[in-house]
Amino acid sequence: MRQQGTMKRTIGLLCALLFCWHSAASEGLPKGIMKLDGRPAPALLLEDMDGQAWDIGKARGRWVFVHFWAAWCGPCRREMPTIQAIFPQFDASELEIVVINTAESEDTVFEFLAAVAPDLNPLMDKDGLVTERWQPRGLPATFLVDPAGRLQYLALGGRPWDSPVYMKFISKIIE
């Protein structure tokens, strides 16, 4: 009985992955980017390390790159410099890049970002509740929220955001 349940879950997961792969391939999406259903983005109201509040509701009218990460996460550590590299490439009136640290101390976050991404001002999810609400299914995870506040794309795992294929993708969706 237990093997049947495991087999059914495995087959279901494989079908879901095949669907996501086919959807991405049919839309010409870069590797690892999944199209989402356009549901409204969950609430996101957090403070940065200076205590300044940031609310996703006030970002209406522009795309938002919402990135969940942690300093202990190996793929996050490799990916963060590529986010730092794209930060100055896009006008904040078209694309706002938001990096959200998941439940780590400010000292840990400051030490890590000072070394690899000094221009990024992280939002601090100190209690992990925003991360829980967004359900990223692992770290790193990046959601692309459209100007109407709807979830359009998800990238799970690390990727070189500063590579031509991802830069072209972002440029295309924000135009």
Predicted features and spans:
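Positively charged n-region of N-terminal signal peptides that target proteins for export
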Residues: R2-T10
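Bacterial N-terminal signal peptides
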Residues: G12-C20
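N-proximal helix/coil linker or "cap" segments that precede and/or mark the start of modular domains
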Residues: H22-A43
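Short active-site neighborhood of thiol/selenol oxidoreductases, capturing the structured segment around
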Residues: G57-G74
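Hydrophobic beta-strand core positions in alpha/beta domains
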Residues: H67, V99, F143-L144
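Structural microenvironment flanking redox-active thiols in thiol-disulfide oxidoreductases
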Residues: R77-V116, K126-R133
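Thiol/disulfide oxidoreductase modules built on the thioredoxin-like
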Residues: E111-D119, D125-S171
